[in-house]
Amino acid sequence: MTILLIVAGILLSSVPVVLAYIRFRNLKDEAAYKDLMTKAMIVGLLSCPAGFLLSGVFAIIERVFHINEMGLLGAAYHKIILLALAEEIVKTFLFIRFTKKHSYPYSWLDLIAIGTTVTIGFEIGESMVMLGSEPIVMLLRGISAMHMCFGFVIAWGYGKYQKTGKILPFVLCFLLSWLWHGLYDFGLSEELLALNDNFAALSISLAVIAFAYMIYIFIFIPKAAKKEVYTTPIIR
């Protein structure tokens, strides 16, 4: 039964994000765009080690200051900072670096597609790393496509920043994704659940929201493709 749940978790974590990637990739027929999408996926798949590296830096801070011995506070640091913040920083950095490195007349929708694709690659890579995790955790993350949702929000905010020159939406989108990610992980921590099992409802609720948001992403893609505000190349 456990093996079946693990297999189900892997499939569930792959199918929605792969479908989203295909949908984004097929927005344009031009070879240059499809090449960018392929490269963005590769960057995402290879981004897990960079995430582990930054988490390692935060882990050193955790050890030096004995944060891991601070009970619930230590668990909050581990889940919200060491894991969630490190991963969101790495994915966002690699996404922005990618768009700077590869010259292309990006539209707002292009930036959303590239940014989401980088996180899709990260999500697929992480699902392989998480093979030893609790099956229920894999199922929750798989059904809700958490990283894809985080990446979409950040990419939308970055695209808004590039479109308007106003950085606040980008900052708010990053903070939203980080807290969404961090609180989800923290809600499943042993230290918090030891106080009351009902705290698991926090993570379940955030996973349900992510599932609903994943559906919204699939609705958003074809609608945005018909709007000039999203498809017109950004000139700054």
Predicted feature locations:
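Hydrophobic alpha-helical segments at protein termini of multi-pass membrane proteins
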Residues: 1-236
